[in-house]
């Protein structure tokens, strides 16, 4: 094993001949470099995806479209991202993790700039579809890289830090676009986001250490189908895939339509104020790492259902017409979501024993499919029954998620060191 790792410049000790290569542990330089690089990747992924969310009411006016149609600017991206995950995960199993991560983020940045230059709504949607497809290479591979390289005892923390990057990216993307769109055109805002993503891609290339535990798998269709079938035979993985759909579907639905609610009576918030609500993501940054660490300590099965219950409580508070209660509800909901996603993500990596890239891909396929389907379906509930309809829809998704989490808590864990409790 070389003492340097390609363009990343990360160093590692050279093991004795025949000695096993150790996993990366907390407190080492390699852990810090990995955390920084994937934090940047997670940041850019969510910033590029969700910077369009605060613009949706404005896009409705600019293009003469309704809320459900406007939501396509996000739903189409998450749909192509979901489909892309079924391709990019297996590609990374064949050619390596870092290469796929860096090229994917660079492509997403270029397509985001392309969306800013598109002359029509259809052109914007086409570019956004390509953004989602490119980001699939970051979304699946980052989780797999961590599962392979980080010591199992520190995987929950590392996954939490990565998802914290997602949270900060989602917050920053919404915050920047929500505020700037009052002063700049939406074209300019998207161009700016593309430039920031280019910087994140450079960070990822420079700091992410090359894999030490990656073993190439030939890219064969039969092997892919066998890998997917293998994961669905596991007693826990299919339920975790379903959780991705339910959790992300509820989360995106809330943030897609809360802007429409808060612009209208009795709140009358400005576009800038709605953009500033992205600071609620700070709770997700804290919860993703802390809940992940708690799951490492007390067990995922004991923590998972609690954070989902917290999301339900948050949705209930948003049904009131008092702004402080709505904001508190959004805070609890966001805290619970990122905590739950952190637990589920690390659980996938610990439970999948083979073809981990495909396991991550299946989880995130369900995750972003939930975003795409539920995120647009929520618009139907909004037009039919206002926020009460949206709240009922979200609560229904979360009640199913809670039942699934309680079922997972009763599953017999795999023997150590194969899976976490």
Go through the PLM ranges and name each one.
Residues 21-28, 209-241:
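Juxtamembrane intracellular "pre-TM" segments in multi-pass secondary transporters
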Residues 83-122:
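Conserved MFS/SLC helix-loop-helix module at the cytosolic interface between two early adjacent transmembrane helices
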Residues 123, 152, 161-208:
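Helix-loop-helix hairpin linking two adjacent transmembrane segments in secondary transporters
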Residues 107, 111-114, 122-130, 324-332:
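Paired small-residue
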Residues 127-166:
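Cytoplasmic helix-loop-helix junction between adjacent transmembrane helices
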Residues 99-113, 302-316, 395:
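Structural signature of the two symmetry-related core transmembrane helices
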Residues 64, 96, 117-123, 151, ...:
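Helix-breaking motifs and short loop linkers at transmembrane-helix boundaries and internal kinks
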Residues 301-344:
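C-terminal transmembrane helical hairpin of 12-TM major facilitator-type secondary transporters
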